[in-house]
Amino acid sequence: MAVRLMKQCTCLLREATRLVPTVAPVGRLRLAGVACKTLTSSVSSPSSGSLTELLGKEQVFTPYPEHQEVDYLIEKATRPEELLELLGGDHSLHHNHAALILIRLSYLLSEKPKEKALLVEDARFQQLVRLVDSQITSVWHGTLVKLLRSLYTLVLPQGSKELRSVEQEVRWRLRRLKYKHLVFLAESCAPFMKEQHSKELLAELLRHLERRWTEISDSRTLVSMMTMAGHLSESLMNRLEDKCLELVEQFGPDELRKVLMTLAAQSRRSVPLLRAISYHLVQKPFPMTKGMLLDLAYAYGKLSFHQTQVAQRLAADLLPFIPSMTPGEVARCAKSFAFLKWLNLPLFEAFTQHLLNSAQDVSLSHLCSVLLAFARLNFHPEQEDQFFNLVHEKLDSVLGSLEPALQVDLVWALCVLQQVQVAELQTVLHPGLHTRFLESKSPKDQSTFQKLVHINSTALLEYPEYKGPFLPASAVAPSPSPSNKKMTPLQKELQDALKALLGNNDTGSLEVATQYGWVLDAEVLLDAEGHFLPLRDFVAPHLAQPVGNQPLPPGAKRIAFLRWEFPNFNSRSKDLLGRFVLARRHVLAAGFLVVDVPYYEWLDLKSEWQKTAYLKDKMRKAVAEELAK
């Protein structure tokens, strides 16, 4: 055994002595370690590899050379010519230098597209690209990912062999790259990969980012990934949201803003993450700038995420900034709170005052945005006359020249706020405008036409001096509601209670579609004694196609039941949104007594008897209030 061991040691030492001259100086110490390791391991492992194989494996990762003069020349270069001259000079370029020159070239020409085009045609540049291609396997990881970004920004031809070579090298190394390098690729190269048909590289990059998501340890990387790459992969975004929940305590106000804006841009209503962010916004007294507050309000509004304490803080923190806001920022802020359905009276009064103070600088588009926000929330400012005088003054000469859908939106908003003028009604009810919406089948155009029906109803019911034009009778005829439309719990319970109350189909109707663009939950007729009358026997002017012909008997009352769901109200309020205030006003103007059935009252009713008694009591109160007038 000892003799065999001595023979093996002698062979290994002879081989090591022969190989020493071929090893670079920086590797000599490493060689000793390798030889020693080989000697010891060969005793216990007869299958261990030869020294040559170990040396080959050891030399795969060459050490980064010391900083040379050429490195300083590359870093200090201010003109492309200085960099290209390095190729033909006496400088010794190692395997990274050519790539570094390309990276520096792309930086110098980042905002000079004309010079980029000339550079790509330069023979020296083409020589440089070929040199990089020949050395690509020796380029270090960090330099390689920057090189790919630089080649994209230099706009090489899509079929460029050298570009494809760099992309392929990146693909081969993806598994070995650090996560920060993957993040760099996602941040800087993903848009180019999509545009330049490098979809395989992009897909593989996203797979590696998703598999290694647990390596994210800092908030900056996480937020950057959500912003730059989250929209490219649903599964990756899900992982990033999970990581956000883990790291959200480390976020500062700007990082919270970026996450919220990313969620808003992708319309991702991630409730657990939104709750966590809201908690930290409320609990931590972050100092926030005007821009941050505006972005937060926009994101919460876009995602329709209602959090009372956050909305209160945003409104309170924004109030001191209003005098310094531009009209555009006021419009954006008002729209955000309108989407949130949050009416903060001091804030909205400040909006009004600021617009009146800067009336000369307010553009029509910004004023329109504020008007639509006011209408959504049914907000009537204290300086109502001055504000609407400004609105009419701005609209007076240009309303008819605006985009048709915008014309309808503006006049509809004025109808909601009871500030519309006859000339404005005539502009949007003109046959030349409504025909295009009547014939269209797109949901957006149908929604606009529904607003036209509401405007037409306003003209009919609230403006007796208005003489026309009106929408044609065929246009206002309600279309049949889809049979598969899902009923809300309140709607179903209310219908069941009404059926139990009425008992007979002749004494009431459910889901009554009127010619005014509104649907009544139920309609009944009461005589002077308070007894039900058969509906079908009497005239019904609110229907597009009346069924009866007898006039109502003296003292008879027509009653409409209107249910109000949770989304019909301003947030944390019992005040209806503007659209539903308009509906109630129209129903009253059409000659009905209204029985309101709000969700917050209905929820307190547990038994069928309570629900029936509630409806009877509401009818008696409606009749008593009418008689008391």
Swiss-Prot record:
Positions of the RAP domain: 559-617
A GO BP annotation: regulation of mitochondrial mRNA stability
Annotated compartments: Mitochondrion matrix
Pfam families xrefs: FAST_1, FAST_2, RAP
GO molecular function, one term: RNA binding
Family as reported in the entry's similarity comment: Belongs to the FAST kinase family.
PANTHER family: FAST KINASE DOMAIN-CONTAINING PROTEIN 4, FAST LEU-RICH DOMAIN-CONTAINING
Descriptive protein name: FAST kinase domain-containing protein 4
Organism: Rattus norvegicus
